[in-house]
Amino acid sequence: MDAAELRAMQAPIKERYKADPSAAVITLKAKGSIETEGLTCKVETGRALAVAGLHPASGGSGLELCSGDMLLEALVACAGVTLKAVATALDIPLRSGIVAAEGELDFRGTLGVAKDAPVGFRRIRLRFDIDTDAPQDRLDQLLKLTERYCVVYQTIKSGPPVDVQMARV
């Protein structure tokens, strides 16, 4: 896909959102079932069933997916797609690229071993290794706009309010 095709594809969507801003507000959903056997949650992905369990550092077997890894994978996926879309829109040719994310967790926090240990990632690092002949100023612009428009990156960075409820069934 080139910049003209991307613009043509997105133009009617952008026009609709400009004309009716409420049409741009979409509710994304995820759902999982808590299993009676084992310490797992089966997440419906729309493509397959993903079974998440405890990370080995908190007693898990390592056979199930780890939610922390899934968070990083969502960041990599979103950042990669966003980078490619922005590069396409800016006519920055990319021959290939790798997107990688990593972060440290102190498992004492989630295991309740130390009250001063935070629960969650201390820091996340996101890296793009791309094969291109584009000049550095264009790559700087590409990175800036990728950060600006990546939904998962902005969500992690901004930390929106999260409402939690529990209901008896």
What are these language model-derived features?
Residues 1-73, 83-169:
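Extended beta-strand/beta-hairpin segments
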